Amino acid sequence: KDDIHLDEEKAELGMMAVGYYAILESAFRFNKNLSIENQSDFVAEMYAYFSKVASRNKDAWTDSALDANEIKNITKKNSLQAFPYNKYHCTSWNVNQSAAIIVCSEKIADDLDIPQEKRVYPLASSENNHMIGTLQRPKLYEQHGMQLAAKYILDVCQKLKIEPNFYDLYSCFPVAVQMFAESLNLSDYKKFTITGGMSFAGGPLN
């Protein structure tokens, strides 16, 4: 949101999101006491896995799987956007896709002969608008809105004794994916996506 950016932020970073998320990535890494090299390797391996998942997703915009070195190393095709992010770390503006979730009653689904195995029954959703300007956050590596949204879902799962089978942590930049995972108590990046993520399966503003 434009109204939560301070004048100092706009002067230094402009309004391009990659600069903000790159700073959050560095803060997140520093809080974990990880070296730049170790974090770079981890993110590259995670996104290489995402790319592999997307290559098998018929609805993804790309079917070419990238390896970790292709994502990590700066090249003409993978230029530096804002340290530590290269192009392949970021979502692509040029992707033009759309998707829809159709919500209807069970009677309508019956009338339309929707097979039972094709139906999904939503149990809960969570949204949080607890947004704070980047420079106003006490700790750059903590996202309270994200944590509150995740806690609600985790509490519902606990109450209903549900263990989720699938996750899709879908965001423009790696640090947001990692923060989502941490908020949901996930550590294995092979559980983070079933689509391939926004960088390889989709795009922003679609």
Functional labels for PLM-detected ranges:
Residues 1-108, 114-203:
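Conserved "HGTGT" condensation-loop signature of ketosynthase/thiolase-family condensing enzymes
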Residues 206:
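C-terminal catalytic subdomain
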